[in-house]
From Swiss-Prot:
<dbReference type="GO" id="GO:0045454">
    <property type="term" value="P:cell redox homeostasis"/>
</dbReference>
<dbReference type="GO" id="GO:0033554">
    <property type="term" value="P:cellular response to stress"/>
</dbReference>
<keyword id="KW-0560">Oxidoreductase</keyword>
<comment type="function">
    <text>Thiol-specific peroxidase that catalyzes the reduction of hydrogen peroxide and organic hydroperoxides to water and alcohols, respectively. Plays a role in cell protection against oxidative stress by detoxifying peroxides and as sensor of hydrogen peroxide-mediated signaling events.</text>
</comment>
<dbReference type="InterPro" id="IPR036249">
    <property type="entry name" value="Thioredoxin-like_sf"/>
</dbReference>
<dbReference type="GO" id="GO:0006979">
    <property type="term" value="P:response to oxidative stress"/>
</dbReference>
<dbReference type="InterPro" id="IPR024706">
    <property type="entry name" value="Peroxiredoxin_AhpC-typ"/>
</dbReference>
<protein>
    <recommendedName>
        <fullName>Thioredoxin peroxidase</fullName>
        <ecNumber>1.11.1.24</ecNumber>
    </recommendedName>
</protein>
<comment type="function">
    <text>Antioxidant. Could be involved in protection against reactive oxygen species (ROS) generated by metabolic processes and/or protection of the parasite against ROS released by immune effector cells.</text>
</comment>
<dbReference type="Pfam" id="PF00578">
    <property type="entry name" value="AhpC-TSA"/>
</dbReference>
<dbReference type="GO" id="GO:0042744">
    <property type="term" value="P:hydrogen peroxide catabolic process"/>
</dbReference>
<dbReference type="GO" id="GO:0008379">
    <property type="term" value="F:thioredoxin peroxidase activity"/>
</dbReference>
<dbReference type="GO" id="GO:0005829">
    <property type="term" value="C:cytosol"/>
</dbReference>
<comment type="similarity">
    <text>Belongs to the peroxiredoxin family. AhpC/Prx1 subfamily.</text>
</comment>
<dbReference type="InterPro" id="IPR050217">
    <property type="entry name" value="Peroxiredoxin"/>
</dbReference>
<keyword id="KW-0575">Peroxidase</keyword>
<keyword id="KW-0676">Redox-active center</keyword>
């Protein structure tokens, strides 16, 4: 089972990038933060809301040197057709990140999000650092979508930690107080926070 601080499994596969099919690999993104987001199926109900929400906020991720890749077990042909559908009828339109097609289910299986019985994936979010190490893992059952705000908050927290060495308490947001991870540092935080 994958856990934080483990190397992310490398993968390579066909994706819809813009209006074209391209082969992408995790190694293409070395030196960047990556959110690898799995979703159950194209043409469903919650999935387009997540994909559109993140695509519309892609500039926020790009400013943080973060690439986003969405992945399902659908084919590139299915992905492409979905991008051609208007958002007003359940389509996703033009996206600002790749849609990876995991038709052979190898990527979903490697990341532990494949529902073997159904042949599709759970909603999984994997935050991968610029060295290719898993930093955060979240897996949801199908009915509940992800939060763009929470994805950005987690990304900001890990970037802050990498840059400053301090740790981020519950509900931390940029410019909030952090904790120097020493006995005296934590006392200073707790005395000012409580």
């Amino acid at each position: 089972m994958l856990q934080p601080n483990m190397p992310a499994p490398n993968f390579s596969g066909q994706a819809v990038v813009g209006k074209e099919f391209e082969t992408i690999s995790l190694s293409d993104y070395k030196g960047k933060w990556v959110i690898l987001a799995f979703y159950p199926l194209d043409f469903t109900f919650v999935c387009p809301t997540e994909i559109i929400a993140i695509s519309d906020q892609m500039e926020q991720f790009a400013q943080r040197n973060c690439a986003v890749i969405f992945c399902s077990t659908d084919s590139v042909y299915s992905h492409l057709q979905w991008t051609k559908m208007d958002r007003k009828v359940g389509g996703i339109g033009q996206l600002n990140f790749p849609l990876l097609a995991d038709k052979n289910m190898s990527v979903s299986r490697a990341f532990g999000v494949l529902d073997e019985e159904q042949g599709n994936t759970y909603r999984g979010n994997f935050l991968i650092d610029p060295k290719g190490v898993l930093r955060q893992i979240t897996v949801n059952d199908d009915p509940v979508g992800r939060s763009v705000e929470e994805a950005l908050r987690l990304l900001d927290a890990f970037i802050f930690h990498e840059e400053h060495g301090e740790v981020c308490p519950a509900n931390w947001k940029p410019k909030s107080k952090t904790i120097v991870p020493t006995p005296d540092g934590s006392k200073a935080y707790f005395s000012s926070a409580n």
